[in-house]
Amino acid sequence: LLYMYNMKKVTLFATGIIMMSCAQQQQKLTYPETAKVDTVDVYFGTEVPDPYRWLENDTSAATAAWVEAQNKVTNDYLSKIPFRDALLKRLTDVANYEKIGTPFKKHGKYYFYKNDGLQNQSVLYVQDSLDGEPRVFLDPNKLSDDGTVALTGIYFSNNGKYTGYTIARSGSDWQEIYVMDTETGKLLDDHIEWAKFTGATWQGDGFYYSAYDAPVKGKEFSNVNENHKIYYHKMGTPQSQDKLVYQNQAYPKRFYTASVNEDETILFLYESGDGRGNALYMKDLRKPNAPFVAMATDMDYTYAPIEVIGDKIY
């Protein structure tokens, strides 16, 4: 009897939601008109119309007005859903619990990410020992007023002196690299822009990173990204002085990233984009002007170094 009673309550609740949903669906939605423009590309002799390309210009006044009109239609509809506030409250209650990531050890200290419950971004903590007192190492929530700057990577220099970190703003693929003093937490002047699909690989008094040329102003999110490059940034110098380490203009759509072994003697280059895996190259940093030497050139498999011991790479 109790089971039947509970099932009856569930059925009535579900029926109520369905009835309210049907009432919502009866509302007539009048969508704003979307202008069409005469834009045509020709590919191998075939004309391909693209009448809505003007919407790719996400910084134009016309696009902003279109988005505002679309949002008004959406928000007017959603605001009339009677159980919306109750649903939001329930989802908020369910998500509001402490979340702690797996700790990792670097230079004798322990780091971990923690979210108190409803924070936009998880905070990186550090403690001196396993039973030490945790303290905030880097709080990405303080990197913007609205909490939309995400910490996408953390990179400690091999000597522990510097900590590089990458951020992304508002969900963008573009990344920026910042560096701080590991001991004091002081943010240093080194700042890299227009990085993408990259980390910061330390070697000596600087690091390698991957980036594209700066896009045309106003087209930061619509420009085609081509010619991915690897640079070396020396600490204390502006990005304009960074050394170009590798590019391959014969394959403008491919991606290039780098890593360095623990002894900082070998620079590894990963090339991807044409298959499921990556090609792998190496460069001996002990030899001035040494070239990159191919280790594996097909991209059907994933290749990565395990260790460098003497003159052998595993």
Locate each region found by the language model.
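Positively charged n-region of N-terminal signal peptides that target proteins for export
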Residues: 2-10
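Beta-propeller folds
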Residues: 13, 22-314
